[in-house]
């Protein structure tokens, strides 16, 4: 019985260490969306591998938020598959169809370090994917590539 009681803390320590190690490449960033009185939280999937999985975009209203409580009023969200590690989330002007787009970037796990990105626009009650690019060179102009993708999508209609 004594031996089992000693083994239990050791087993817990191993499980806790494994859970922490699986989350070393996690990503969480809050991005202000001031024109809509919103804030977006972009986060990679918990306990997923670094090289593949998903990320979430959660949008909260800040219209009536007290300081420090800007993620209390959930409005909408989106879940997107990813092939690589989420590296950044930021606002960008992508032209007339997406003047205040939320951009999420990823870097592939392969030797080329290729870059991909998705652009989202928000409304008072929705978040919508407007463009996606993949396989870009590591030093590519992501905003320009997304603008071009939006233009192609518009011309295809």
Description of each model-found segment:
Residues 14-19:
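N-terminal signal peptide c-region/cleavage motif recognized by signal peptidases
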Residues 20-157:
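Exposed acidic/polar residues on beta-strands and adjacent loops within beta-sheet cores, strongest
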Residues 1-8:
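Bacterial N-terminal signal peptides that target proteins for export
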């Amino acid at each position: 019985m004594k031996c089992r009681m000693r083994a239990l803390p050791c087993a817990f320590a191993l499980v806790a260490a494994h859970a922490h190690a699986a989350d070393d490449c996690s990503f969480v960033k809050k991005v202000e969306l001031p024109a809509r009185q919103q804030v977006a939280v972009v986060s990679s999937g918990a306990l997923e591998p670094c090289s593949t999985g998903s990320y979430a975009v959660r949008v909260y209203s800040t219209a009536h938020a007290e300081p420090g409580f800007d993620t209390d009023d959930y409005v909408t969200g989106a879940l997107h598959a990813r092939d690589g590690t989420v590296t950044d989330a930021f606002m960008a002007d992508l032209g007339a169809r997406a003047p205040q787009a939320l951009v999420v970037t990823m870097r592939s796990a392969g030797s080329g370090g290729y870059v991909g990105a998705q652009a989202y626009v928000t409304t008072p009650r929705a978040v919508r994917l407007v463009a996606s690019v993949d396989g870009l060179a590591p030093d590519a102009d992501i905003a320009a590539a997304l603008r071009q993708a939006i233009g192609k999508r518009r011309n295809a209609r």
